[in-house]
């Protein structure tokens, strides 16, 4: 079958290392009855492995040439549905299933953060997620309070999910090799986080505002939102830096604004 050219604007790096592919599938541990959604399947390297493990697989691919390639490659498969769609705009709840989705994929590095936020907005229909991401992004997601990598993505990811850094993948596992290392992460939705954010948009705004001034104290960083008299009510020291605040702290700040 004719190979498809890579498109730089889609951030395409195709995984080809069979050992890494098998390791990813083992981490996902798909079951026959699962409904899997693969984002950015490319030429189907991971898809081939997933098809042998589950009976319901959906592919979301934006590249029309790759969609045509995949349709031809899997035209005899009855357990696969291909959506030509931008994952940033895709309604994951539209996938026909009576079970929560298991979402997987080698996410394009140039859209990985906004795509994660899009998935967080649809977390109600997701059982878990396993992604290949730039190693730096995985470090930011899993960063602990007070660390250099702890920031907006860390806070929001921890609010929505329990996150586990699984393993690193070298550039040589891809064609063409990216200039950075990659890593596999597991994200399991948290449906009972406490305290509950009353307004998720407000929470996101507070976190974004705080980390826009991460070298300032949180009292100064959020002075447009929180007046000095409110900090004692929150039981948060306004002299702390944003990276020293827990997810719970940010939720409390967000909730006092509602």
UniProtKB/Swiss-Prot annotation:
InterPro entries: KsgA/Erm, rRNA_Ade_diMease-like_C, rRNA_Ade_Mease_Trfase_CS, rRNA_Ade_methylase_Trfase_N, rRNA_adenine_dimethylase, SAM-dependent_MTases_sf. GO terms for molecular function: 16S rRNA (adenine(1518)-N(6)/adenine(1519)-N(6))-dimethyltransferase activity; RNA binding. Keywords: Cytoplasm, Methyltransferase, RNA-binding, rRNA processing, S-adenosyl-L-methionine, Transferase. S-adenosyl-L-methionine binds at residues 13, 15, 40, 61, 86, 106. GO terms for cellular component: cytosol. Coiled coil: none annotated. It catalyses: adenosine(1518)/adenosine(1519) in 16S rRNA + 4 S-adenosyl-L-methionine = N(6)-dimethyladenosine(1518)/N(6)-dimethyladenosine(1519) in 16S rRNA + 4 S-adenosyl-L-homocysteine + 4 H(+). It is found in: Cytoplasm. Its EC number is 2.1.1.182. Its main location: cytoplasm. It comes from the Bacteria. Belongs to the class I-like SAM-binding methyltransferase superfamily. rRNA adenine N(6)-methyltransferase family. RsmA subfamily. HAMAP family: 16SrRNA_methyltr_A. Specifically dimethylates two adjacent adenosines (A1518 and A1519) in the loop of a conserved hairpin near the 3'-end of 16S rRNA in the 30S particle. May play a critical role in biogenesis of 30S subunits. This is Ribosomal RNA small subunit methyltransferase A. It comes from Coxiella burnetii (strain RSA 331 / Henzerling II).
């Amino acid at each position: 079958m004719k190979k498809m050219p890579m498109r730089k604007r889609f951030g395409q790096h195709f995984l080809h290392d069979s050992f890494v592919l098998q390791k990813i599938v083992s981490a996902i541990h798909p079951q026959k009855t699962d409904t899997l959604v693969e984002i950015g399947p490319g030429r189907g390297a991971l898809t081939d492995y997933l098809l042998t493990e589950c009976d319901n697989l959906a592919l979301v691919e934006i590249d029309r040439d790759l969609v045509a390639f995949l349709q031809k490659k899997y035209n005899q498969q009855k357990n696969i549905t291909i959506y030509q769609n931008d994952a940033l705009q895709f309604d994951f709840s539209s996938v026909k299933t009576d079970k929560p989705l298991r979402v997987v994929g080698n996410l394009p590095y140039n859209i990985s953060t906004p795509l994660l936020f899009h998935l967080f907005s649809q977390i109600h229909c997701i059982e878990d997620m396993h992604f290949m991401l730039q190693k730096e992004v995985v470090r930011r997601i899993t960063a602990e309070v007070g660390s250099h990598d702890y920031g907006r993505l860390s806070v929001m990811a921890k609010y929505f999910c329990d996150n586990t850094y699984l393993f690193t993948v070298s550039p040589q596992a891809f064609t063409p090799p990216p200039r950075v290392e990659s890593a596999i992460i597991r994200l399991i939705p948290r449906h009972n986080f406490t305290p509950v954010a009353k307004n998720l948009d407000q929470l996101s705004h507070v976190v974004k505002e705080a980390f826009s001034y991460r070298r300032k104290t949180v009292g100064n960083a959020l002075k447009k939102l929180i007046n000095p008299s409110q900090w004692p009510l929150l039981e948060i020291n306004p002299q702390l830096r944003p990276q020293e605040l827990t997810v719970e702290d940010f939720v409390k700040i967000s909730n006092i604004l509602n």
